[in-house]
Amino acid sequence: MEIKLGNNKLKIFDNKKQKINYKLRAVKSDYTLSYEKKLTMDKYMDGRETVDLISIRDNNKIIGEFFLNSNDEMIFIYDVYLLKLIRVSNDVVFENDDNEEKEDEFNNYYDFSEGVMIGLKTPREENDDGTYSIEKYRTLWVSYNNYKLGYIYAKDNIIFPRLTGIWNLSVYQDSSNGFNSDEFQVSLYDENDKKEKSIKDENTTNIYKSILFVGNDYIAIKEYIGNEFKGNYPIYKILPVSNVNIDNGLQINEVFNESEKIKYINELKNKINSLSIEEKEGLNIENIDYNNIAIKRELGKWRFVSKILPKNMNEEGEEVNLDILPDKRFINYNLMYISWKDLKNELGIFKDVFISPLYKIALIQFNEYISIYKIEDGNIIAEPLEMIPINENEEVVMAEWCSGKYVEQWEKVFIDGEVILDNNY
């Protein structure tokens, strides 16, 4: 791979930028290089109080940063990539691309459309009498064609795609003997009304379940089992959609390959070693449950998480964010073309971001809105195309994208739902 930096030009990953400029500033050890990698400048200070950091700007927006470790070695940050580069030449030549104008013309007229199902969860809350509400779920449908947004719909429950069609996931609470038990109901969407609830034994304890992630073939949940619920869920599970109410989730050998398993165990041990004596006292570190695994959102991606179980199962336990991403078995699309840091510099404080596979729009979650932004030349256009109102405590548990002919097919499921926003923008 070759990267070229000129006085006003840049070429990286076959991407070309014209009329760029540079800005130099001195940064200290606490300067964040990458939120995704949890990396600050501290690693590269080498005894220095400050390091000269050079920002690459395009249309007054930072598109990359770099600093020199030596005369011939550079650390280069571009989008979500952090690269160590070695100088190969001081002479930079940019070849003329005769097809550049034709490619731009093609991109301007290329017909593209995408759609996304966004699954939202309203977590249970404590009522005035000390009881807890039931969690609620709904699915948003957002689509566009050449940046023209279609109707934005909402329907109850989690509506999600599988190879066999569009499916419906709902949660109901079974109450008997004074105990509550959350159960999932999964069916093909058009068979939803015909599906009967599963027959189970009478409840002998409370079981509360909360969805963290929904994919095509698996969901991830957190769970509480007991009679003194305080809003804590110490148990994590990954469950197959085909048998979603089983007692045990996927085991460690079913989730990770051998190298990932070693990495996971090491990260868990490192987490334990970083805890104070007081923190360790409340955890069951003598008998680690390595199968206590889930998937949830962090920094714009779906990631594996684990939890060290507490000795008192009414408590929360200690969460461990793993540096391992789910493979295609769990999620088809899990990329983030724009770094969290760049978005933070551009938009300030936000909760989450979902960038379309065609890299044309971004859905940014704020406290009370999911704002839809257009993407041009790798940059988010500051004025949103539209803002979808959501509740402040709603959490995203699913984002399933489609393009082309599937947009119309998926939308058919939603056209009898609630119209959140029409297309008169």
Region spans (language model):
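Short, solvent-exposed loop/hinge segments that bridge or flank secondary-structure elements
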Residues: 1-9, 56, 126-142
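Edge beta-strand at a domain terminus
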Residues: 19-31, 71, 75-101
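Acidic, serine/threonine- and glycine-rich low-complexity intrinsically disordered segments
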Residues: 199-349
